[in-house]
Structures are given as C-alpha cells and as structure tokens.
Amino acid sequence: MWRHFKSLWRAWGMTSRLDKEGIDLFHGLSNELPLTIRKARHTRSVVTIHDLIFLRYPEYYQWIDRKIYAYKFRKACEYADLVIAISECTKRDIISYFHIPEEKIKVVYQGCDVSFTIPATDEKKQEVREKYSLPEHYILNVGSIEERKNVLLAVKSLLRLPEEMHLVILGRRTAYTDRIDEFIHAHHLEERVKILNGVPFADLPAIYQQAKVFVYPSRFEGFGIPIIEAIYSGIPVVAATVSFS
C-alpha cells in the first residue's frame, strides 16, 4: 500500500521498518525525518538541512507549501539526535527560526563532483560547442531559472558589455523564464542569450571550462554548489555575497 503514497510512507510508515531491520542510524539527507522516528526503539537519527529559504523569502512559495515545509523541517530538527547544516548561514537560520540549540548543529560543507576538476579533452569541448551552438565568448549561469536566482540581472548586464560577449543559461525553465524572454525580445538580445534545458551532466564540465566567467546573482542560497563547480573548473566567479557564508 505504501508504495502508492511515498511521501506519507516517509513521514509515517518508515519507523516500523527501522525496528524490523534493526537499523542503528537513520540519516535524513534532505530536510526531513519520519514524524514517528522517536518511536524507533534502537535507531538514532541525523538530518541534513540545506536551507530555510521558504522562511527567509516566503513570497517565492505557495502558502500551503510554506506550512508543510515549516512543520516537517522543524520537527526533523527537534527529533534528530544531530542536525547537519550545509553552511554557517543555514546553521544561523536553524537557530533563529527553530530555536534549536547550537551545540546540536554541526556544519558540514558541500562539495561537487570530481569531474569538474578534470580538464575536458579538446574533442569533448568541440563536441559540446557544436551540440549546443555555443558562442566563442560567453558568460555562464547554471541553476533553476526562478525569481530568487535573479538571472534577469545577468541578462540586463549584457547591455553594458561588448557585443561579442554572450550569456549561456543552463537550467529548468519556470514561469520566471517568461520575464527573461520578454526582456530579451524587448532589447533585441536574441543573438546574445542562449537558454539550455535538460543538459546531460556529462556535458557540464566542458561547458563550464569554456566559459569566460561564471555569474551567480542569486538573492539567497543555502550554499550554492554551482559556484564550487565553477571554481573547480578554473573559471572566474562573480556572485552575490548576501548569503554565501
């Protein structure tokens, strides 16, 4: 039965399985624990919290989503034997919003795939350049295309840059993308902005490594893994400083 209601199983149905399997430690990797985790007789628990953006910027989320996230995240922090925050910023937010004791929280920074540290071959670079019709000189942005990511600011910056500089955006299209498209058309930037969706992971290092600079104007991030990917790729990074701490 539970296979038809996976989210309910994670919240309510998993604890009995922990006892049955004799699990010593359960790690909730993405912000939640079973709501009945304390009923597991022999299982200690750890939860990793990535960010609390829905509390810092509630205007970017639906009301019902904010309520669900707040309840699940708070309970996970309260019930866990240890809370892992992926940045000092996230740690401060957990303390501020959920009043979790500081000594219960450990900061463990994130990394990225080692493939970004390996120089792509000339053949691979040429392959992805032809596959995606990449320009010779481009600024790169990677991440979901949503208002919080502030990608429109990067598009606007092209108006102040030389004509030969282009912008390549990699990410999932959302309603916010329509606003970007409108600005592109209004300012005749169609030839200078390329938006790519569904790029295979195997192509990412070669795309990063051919960029002139990586730009990340996001208003808030718990960590910002694309910045690490760009640094590992050996390209300069321009990023907002409001939350990367």
Descriptions of predicted regions:
Residues M1-S245:
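Carbohydrate transferase catalytic cores enriched for Leloir-type hexosyltransferases
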